[in-house]
Amino acid sequence: MTKKLDKLRKNIDDIDKKLLELISNRGLLAKEIGLLKDDGVIYKPEREAQVITKLIKENKGPLSNDSVTNIYKAIISNCRALEKKLAISFQVFHQ
């Protein structure tokens, strides 16, 4: 059982590493999007709802739709914070 447990944990560690890389890439894209936004509006609830609705449709489990929603709201919120920091820095720099 210990070997199997170790193997499963190693698989989870590998997945976590990949997830972190993907989330970091998402954050970089959010920063880039922040630079391209002309209207200065960082939070667009309709876009967040669109992203989450699409993910729920793709969800095949085992996580519940509520779990997927909670996870992605946290990811989106933290990526939005990157956009906001960039927007504030841009405004201060160009005043």
Q: Where on the chain are the PLM-derived regions?
A:
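Domain-level signature for soluble enzymes in the chorismate/prephenate branch of the shikimate pathway
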Residues: 1-95
